[in-house]
């Protein structure tokens, strides 16, 4: 044996005996194995493999390990450290396996087990399958590159059975999984880059992985971070995670918590930014962002939970959803201060947030933009929203199939082309307090039994105008507007149909006409159709609308203790097919008509199936403490329609009070107006086929006036003769009065009552203190056509007694009595009756009146069948069908006969008109006069002074105005 060989063997023997050997020579050894508590330090050496066990320790620097093929080939691991207190520590650019870029002959790089410890600083690991395996081992690695040239690599780092591993600035490439921690293992990652073909970071079965200081995680075809199993947890602060299937994924009790992390899909159709399933939880905090996923975050089944505070979600791809919750009843599902949007200005995500199959979600100050639908709650899910902003092109907020959504604290909801809030289906509910809602179609929409309740919410336009502020369609569909609600720039403020219902408290509606496809549509404040109900239970203001309230086979109630207002440019109240409107404490104005009962003929023209007149007879309007003013239009328009209108303590003041001029056939029912302690103003236009009844009672006053604005179909002002005629079928006057307004352009008015048809019942019925006030220009014996007076022509029977008042003036040469004329043509014909009447049907109060302040007495004489005054003169008959058996009530002077002791006027030789009984009294003691009539007691002194002036001026033939009083 040579001396050199002897020295080598001696050195080896010393290592085995004493446990320490400093190798400085360059010889290549196949294997380095240290055990039994021994320690070996090596540097710049190459080994096929090294092994430390049973407390053995290897400290290596700048080593090349496993760079050549193993001998024997069955050896598959380069570095093995096993057993408690065993240690291998490598540094200074040590290479395990093949050099980078070359294929390795070893399958496994490092195996650490049984509480052994492995440390590595710098260098690289390049093997076919797994670079680091820990089985109840401990590891600490820094600045190491791990890769594989194998086409099918395994886990880069696999740690299990309560292993502990710290990785600092580690780079992993070309791995199936970068880190796989199993069975209560703990892995701490600081910085570094981890790339994998499948899942990059895995925590299983109670293991914990913590990533800090901006680690970079990339999965080419799988999940970025994956935690599966109870107590399996991944924590990450800073850095980026890129995934293909899911960027973050947990299930069966796993937990992931990331903060200030950028989560990015890799552009290969990544489905989920963060996906939690089955009792698992993902928390995203700080400025965490999710980009390029088709579903930003998702929690699915068995109390799976997503919590996200701060940050943003950008999604893309077909059917993209910002946040999805499916079959998860976890009350911890929360998004707070999160912005959700499409990642492309030209792309709209399908849904911003979706909750399905009984899921529970809480949103706090969340913003959703660039979505088809902002929020969908389906199949008995629950979403609670505080603040935030939700914009969508389609329906913004949807609750359907028994789901509920609650919005609080001023949320802002916008739909640019559809409904803003939609509740669809039985038990589907939306509650909202405060905030604004803007919809292009409907701001609020309930259908198929859906329910919406909003309080102190403003329903606004979408920049142009909205179709409807709130719409309820279908049986049991309900919208309740609580607190103070404003609706602006909408075509319809409120709309219900097919059995829906809307109620409101304090409500303001400001309408706006809408242009659709070049057609300008009129706006409506409130519209109820098809057996629906609207109840306006608080102060209501409706303005800038064409139609105020519209009811078709439905009911609208605006009965509350507040002061309400309706300002309509066309019609204040429109009734259609058994519609009902109840109004109280309201001030209403309209440009064309105050109340319009729909034109039945127009419905027939339009081919509507509901044009049977019997279906229209129950339309009704009830006004209490309401003022309805139509200065230039019609108070009540009922063209070929039927129904009722009832007033109590109310007013209708119009240019024309009532109009029905399109009645082509005799209606089934009579239209009825009932006024109780109310005021009416305007004339009446009634078609000859129309049947209209006015019931005036309890001190109601109807003032007839000549229309100033009534026009024909061509827009031309009607002749004043047409405008001064009023027609009505039946009039019941109970403790009420009719007043003819002073003449216009020297034209007086005529009120026609009744049709004169055979078997007609009483068409004029007076009871209690019924009164009629006429205007007249005195003449005596003038032809009937030349007499200037208001008239009442009753073409039918009369019942009861009416007090008559007359006022007017006297013209020059018309003050003298015409005793040459027959008695039944003298004076003025005020009232004519074609049917049954009595001499007492119409009487001047106290039986007489005076003229021009003079003491001359005038009476109202009745000429007709069975009259003590004789028959009326047929030449005086003003009815279309001439018949001598009519009644003519005429204002005539009471003349003194030859037996009275009075002498004729010496100049005219005309018998003297009989003086009223009080003549001597009021000439001698004017202050003692008891006077009744149109002038009250406070004015008697002035009146008597005028009387004395008239008497003194008679001899001088002065022409003074006269007022006929009783």
Regions found by a protein language model. Give the residues of each.
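A common structural microfeature
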Residues: 55-57, 76, 85, 959-965
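Surface-exposed intrinsically disordered loops and tails
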Residues: 601-612, 709-720, 865-877
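Secretion/assembly modules of Gram-negative surface proteins
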Residues: 2-12, 20-25, 29, 41-43, ...
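Strand-connecting loop/turn motifs
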Residues: 115, 699, 957-961
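Beta-strand repeat architectures
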Residues: 33-38, 51-58, 81-88, 161-162, ...
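Glycine-rich beta-solenoid repeat tracts in large extracellular/virion proteins
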Residues: 27-33, 48-54, 73-84, 102-114, ...
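Beta-strand-rich solenoid/repeat architectures in extracellular/passenger domains
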Residues: 35-47, 57-77, 87-106, 117-129, ...
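Extracellular beta-strand/loop-rich repeat segments of large surface/secreted proteins
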Residues: 660, 664-834
């Amino acid at each position: 044996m040579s001396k050199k060989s002897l020295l080598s063997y001696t050195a080896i023997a010393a290592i085995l005996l004493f446990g320490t050997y400093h190798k400085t020579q360059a010889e290549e050894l196949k294997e380095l194995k240290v055990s039994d508590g021994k320690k070996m330090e090596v540097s710049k050496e190459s080994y096929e493999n090294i092994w430390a066990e049973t407390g053995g320790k290897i400290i290596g620097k700048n080593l090349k390990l496993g760079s050549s093929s193993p001998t024997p080939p069955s050896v598959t691991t380069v570095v093995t450290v096993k057993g408690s207190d065993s240690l291998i520590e490598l540094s200074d650019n040590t290479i395990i396996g093949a050099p980078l870029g070359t294929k390795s002959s070893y399958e496994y790089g490092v195996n650490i087990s049984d509480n052994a410890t492995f440390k590595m600083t710098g260098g690289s690991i390049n093997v076919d399958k797994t670079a680091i395996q820990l089985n109840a081992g401990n590891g600490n690695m820094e600045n190491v590159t791990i890769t594989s040239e194998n086409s099918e690599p395994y886990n880069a780092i696999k740690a299990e059975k309560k292993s502990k591993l710290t990785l600092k600035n580690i780079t992993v490439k070309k791995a199936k999984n970068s880190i796989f921690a199993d069975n209560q293992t703990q892995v701490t990652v600081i910085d570094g880059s981890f790339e994998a073909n499948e899942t990059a970071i895995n925590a299983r079965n109670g293991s914990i992985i913590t990533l800090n200081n901006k680690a970079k995680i990339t999965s080419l075809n799988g999940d970025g971070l994956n935690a599966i199993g109870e107590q399996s947890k991944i924590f990450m602060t800073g850095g980026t995670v890129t995934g293909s299937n899911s960027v973050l994924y947990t299930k069966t009790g796993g937990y992931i918590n990331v903060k200030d992390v950028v989560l990015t899909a890799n552009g290969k159709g990544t489905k989920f930014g963060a996906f939690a399933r089955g009792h698992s939880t993902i928390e995203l905090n700080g400025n965490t962002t999710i980009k390029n996923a088709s579903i930003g975050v998702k929690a699915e089944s068995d109390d799976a939970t997503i919590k996200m505070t701060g940050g943003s979600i950008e999604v893309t791809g077909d059917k993209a959803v910002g946040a999805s919750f499916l079959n998860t009843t976890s009350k911890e599902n929360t998004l707070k201060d999160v912005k959700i949007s499409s990642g492309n200005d030209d792309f709209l995500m399908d849904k911003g947030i979706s909750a399905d199959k009984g899921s529970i979600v809480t949103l706090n100050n969340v913003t959703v933009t660039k979505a088809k639908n902002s929020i969908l709650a389906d199949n008995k899910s629950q979403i609670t929203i505080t603040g935030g902003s939700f914009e969508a092109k389609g329906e913004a907020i949807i609750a359907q199939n028994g789901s509920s959504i609650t919005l609080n604290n001023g949320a802002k909801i916008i739909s640019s082309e559809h409904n803003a809030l939609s509740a669809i289906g039985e038990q589907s509910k939306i509650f909202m307090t405060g905030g604004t809602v803007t919809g292009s179609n409907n701001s609020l929409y309930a259908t198929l039994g859906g329910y919406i309740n909003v309080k102190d919410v403003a329903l606004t336009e979408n920049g142009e105008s909205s179709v409807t502020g709130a719409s309820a369609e279908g049986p049991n569909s309900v919208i309740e507007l609580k607190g103070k609600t404003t609706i602006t720039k909408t075509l319809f403020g409120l709309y219900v149909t097919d059995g829906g219902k809307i109620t409101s408290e304090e409500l303001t509606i400001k309408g706006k006409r809408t242009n659709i496809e070049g057609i300008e549509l009129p706006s409506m404040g409130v519209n109820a159709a098809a057996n629906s109900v609207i109840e306006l239970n608080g102060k209501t203001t409706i303005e800038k609308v064409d139609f105020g309230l519209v009811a078709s086979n439905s009911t609208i109630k605006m009965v509350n203790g507040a002061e309400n207002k309706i300002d309509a440019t066309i019609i204040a109240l429109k009734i259609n097919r058994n519609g009902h409107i109840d109004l109280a404490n309201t001030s209403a104005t309209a440009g064309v008509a105050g109340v319009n009962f729909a034109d039945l003929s127009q419905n027939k023209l339009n081919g509507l199936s509901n044009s049977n007149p019997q279906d229209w007879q129950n339309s009704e309007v009830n006004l209490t403490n309401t003022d309805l003013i139509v200065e230039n239009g019609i108070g009540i328009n009922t063209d070929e329609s039927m129904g009722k209108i009832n007033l109590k303590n109310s007013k209708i003041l119009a240019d024309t009070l009532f109009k029905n001029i399109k009645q082509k056939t005799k209606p089934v029912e009579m239209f009825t107006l009932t006024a109780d302690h109310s005021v009416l103003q305007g004339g009446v236009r009634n078609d000859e086929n129309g049947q209209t009844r006015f019931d005036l009672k309890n001190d109601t006053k109807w003032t007839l006036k000549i229309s100033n604005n009534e026009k024909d179909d061509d827009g031309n002002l009607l002749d004043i003769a047409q405008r001064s005629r009023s027609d009505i079928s039946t009039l019941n006057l109970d403790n009420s009065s009719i007043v003819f307004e002073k003449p216009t352009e020297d034209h007086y008015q005529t009120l026609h009552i009744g049709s004169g048809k055979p078997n007609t019942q009483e068409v004029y019925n007076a009871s209690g203190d019924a009164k009629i006030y006429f205007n007249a220009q005195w003449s005596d014996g003038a032809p009937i056509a030349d007499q200037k007076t208001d008239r009442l022509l009753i073409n039918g029977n009369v019942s009861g007694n009416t007090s008559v008042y007359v006022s007017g003036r006297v013209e020059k040469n018309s003050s003298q009595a015409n005793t040459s004329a027959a008695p039944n043509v003298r004076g003025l014909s005020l009232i004519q009756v074609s049917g049954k009447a009595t001499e007492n049907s119409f009487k001047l109060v106290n039986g007489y009146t005076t003229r021009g302040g003079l003491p001359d007495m005038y009476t109202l004489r009745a000429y007709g069948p069975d009259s003590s005054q004789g028959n009326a003169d047929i030449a005086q008959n003003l009815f279309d069908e001439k018949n001598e058996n009519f009644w003519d009530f005429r204002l005539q002077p009471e003349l003194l006969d030859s037996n009275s002791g009075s002498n004729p006027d010496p100049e005219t030789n005309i018998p003297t008109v009989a003086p009223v009984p009080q003549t001597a009294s009021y000439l001698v003691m004017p202050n003692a006069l008891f006077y009744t009539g149109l002038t009250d007691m406070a004015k008697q002194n002035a009146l008597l002074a005028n009387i004395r002036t008239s008497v003194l001026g008679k001899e001088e033939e002065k022409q003074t105005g006269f007022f006929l009083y009783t």
